[in-house]
Amino acid sequence: MALVLIILSFFSCKSSTNQQESKPITSSPRPDWLDGKWQRTNDEENKKTYEHWQKVSDSLYLVLGFTLQQKDTVWKENVQLILKDSMWSYDVFMAGNPNPTSFLFTHIIDSSFVCENAQNEFPKKIAYTLKGDTMRAVISGGGPEILYLFVKE
C-alpha cells in the first residue's frame, strides 16, 4: 500500500510540473519601452503606418495602430496590453467586431515580448523587440510572416 502511495505521489508531482511549464507568462518586466508614437519605416509605397502606445497604468497599455494612404485611413486597430487574472494579454479590437482577439504572453524580457493564440487563423504569434531606436514587430503563423520596422517619432 505504501508503495502505491509513493508511486501516485510521484506521478501527481510530475503532472503538476508539466502543467506549469505550459502556462503563459504571469509576471514580468513591464513593456514601458513601447510608450510613445512610432512610425513604420518599411511601409508599402504611398502608405504611412503608425502605432501610438500609451501606458495607462502598470497593468494597462493602450495602442492605436493605423495606416494612411494620402490622407485617408485605410486600416485601423485598437490594442490593449492588460494584466488580468495574473496573466498578460495582447487584445486586438477590430472595427465591426465587439469581441477582442486575445494573445497570451509566452515570453517577455526588458526589451521584447512574444504572445500567442494558436486558435487564431492569422496571425498565431506576435513578437515585439526593441533594438537601439528601432522597434521590430513580427506577425506569423497561419500565413506569411510579416515584418514591421518602426522608429520613435
What residue ranges belong to the model's regions?
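Tryptophan-anchored aromatic micro-motifs
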Residues: 32-47, 61-65
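C-terminal motif of bacterial Sec signal peptides marking the signal peptidase cleavage site
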Residues: 9-12
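N-terminal helix-cap/turn-to-beta initiation motif at the start of protein domains
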Residues: 23-37, 80
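Short, surface-exposed coil-to-beta transition loops
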Residues: 46-50, 74-78, 99-101, 121-125, ...
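Bacterial signal peptide processing site
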Residues: 14-16
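Edge beta-strand at a domain terminus
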Residues: 100, 129-153
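Contiguous, well-ordered beta-strand patches that form the walls/edges
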Residues: 72-120
